[in-house]
Structures are given as structure tokens and as C-alpha cells.
Amino acid sequence: MIAENNQGPTSKKAHTKVFNSFQTKLTVFFTALFLLLQGAAFLTVREAIVQNIFDQSRDQLVAANRIFATRIQATVNALAEGAQILASDFGFRTAVATNDKATILSALNNLGARISADRVILVNLDYAITADTGNPDALVTDFPFYDLIDRAEEEDRAESFTVLDGIIYEFVVVPVLAPVPIAWIAIGVEIDREFADDFRNESTLPLDVTFATGRDEDGWAATVSTLPTAAQSDLPGALAAKGAMLGREPETLVLDDGDYVTLVERLQTPTESVSVNAVL
């Protein structure tokens, strides 16, 4: 006997429909899987690229920090050398001993002009300013950074960043000896936009530099910067947001015009001065 075949046209259509539905689902599944794998691969590659950029930026910042330290030390040495030459000059020591203010001020101005210093101050043994090229007509006032004088007395020289009259200076203090100390010379260069531009231009690395005052509970102020104006305005808030995380390791800061890999170097300041930081 031969069995009768009951599959008609309707049954074949249903079979084809099921097959097509399964094929569609399979296609969608593999397409989704492919896109998922592609997305995961893209994110992995992107993360690797970002990490590589960060690592390169970190290495560049570490190198820039060494260049910065070398530049600062060279400035300190030049200031100290000039101050020590004046301090050992017999005529100058005589003027100091006799309190000849006109001669003292003239000598301080000549020294500043000769070594491109922006401010030269003579401080007596009572920490009082007796002559100041930055404020020549001022009445006698105390030199605000006792710590610098005390360190210079112990070590024959002291250097530090300070904020004086709202301006950042790099100061060097040396004694005037006859043969014991009879006064102190504080000689400084202003850390201004020209100083920051010179450092950036001398660097072989593409970087910006900001000198920021304050920190932590004092709040931040971007006093001098090579950053664009909008980014400079954003910087204090971005630094404050990082808070205690800011240290010797680079951090990423989000500013107006993009992300910056940043290294914050806390510079040496006297105990009486607001803190000064170099933000590279």
C-alpha cells in the first residue's frame, strides 16, 4: 500500500514562513553579536589610546617639571651671585653701616638693573625694611618674611617664592657681612606673564604653565597663566574639585576648551606667605 501524502500548499507556506522567521532571528542575533563585539573592541582600543596619550603626557610633564626646576635654580643662582657681590662691596657696606639711604637705594637699583631683578630690598637686623626699590618712598615697615631671614642667617643664603603686595616673586636673601651680619639683601624677580611665556617657549614640549596662589582652605587663584582666558577662569574651580587628590602625580582637569593632563608642583614659600604652586 502506498500512504497518501496530505501536505498541501497551505502546509508548505507555513513551513516556509517559520523557516524565514527563524532565519531573520538568526540574522538579527548574529548582527547584534557582531555589533556588540565591534563596540567592545572599539571601547578597548579607545581606552588603550586614551591611556597611551595620558602616559605620554605624564612623561612629558615629568620632563617639563625637571626643566622647570633647572630654570628656577638657574634664576636663584644668578640672583644670589649678584646679591653677594653687592653685599661684599666695601662702599655699600659703609653706606649700610652709616644708614646712607640715598646711596643704598642707588646701589640697590643698579644691582637690580644689572642682573634683571625686579625688586631689591634691604632689611636691617630688626627685620625692618630700610630701602626698597619697589616702594622707595614708603615709611619703614617690617619685612614680612621672617622665616627667610632666619634661614639665611643659618645657611648664609635662603631662597623662596613669596607673594608680596599681591605679586608673586622668587626671592633670594643673603647677609651683608662686616664681618658679622649688619643687614640683609632680599633680591627678587617677578613671576609674571613674560616669565611664564619664556618658560613655555624654552620648553621643547607643548605645554602651558600657570602660577596659582592659595590652596586647600585658602582657595585657588590663577595669578599668572599662559592658558586661554576661559580655561584660566575654569582652572581654580577644577583644582579645588580635585582637592586632596592633587599631589606629585598628574591629574586630568576638565577646562573650558578640553581636557588637560596636569601636574601641580607646590613651590617653597616662607611660613608667612600664601602658598605658590606651579601648574604644568
Report each predicted region and the residues it spans.
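Positive-inside N-terminal membrane-insertion signal
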Residues: 1-35
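Juxtamembrane extracytoplasmic/periplasmic/luminal helical "stalk" adjacent to the first N-terminal
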Residues: 22-28, 36-98, 113-118, 160, ...
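Extracytoplasmic/periplasmic sensor domains and loops in membrane signaling proteins
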Residues: 97-107, 113-116, 128-163, 191-206, ...
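Generic short beta-strand
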Residues: 119-121, 174, 209, 250-251, ...
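Short hydrophobic alpha-helical segments used for membrane anchoring or interfacial signaling
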Residues: 120-127, 207-217
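Short clusters of small/polar residues that mark proteolytic maturation junctions
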Residues: 134-135, 173, 186, 225-228, ...
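A short beta-strand signature within small-molecule sensing/ligand-binding domains used
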Residues: 166-175, 247-250, 256-266, 274-275
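Short, hydrophobic beta-strand elements of compact beta-sandwich sensory domains
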Residues: 182-190, 261-280
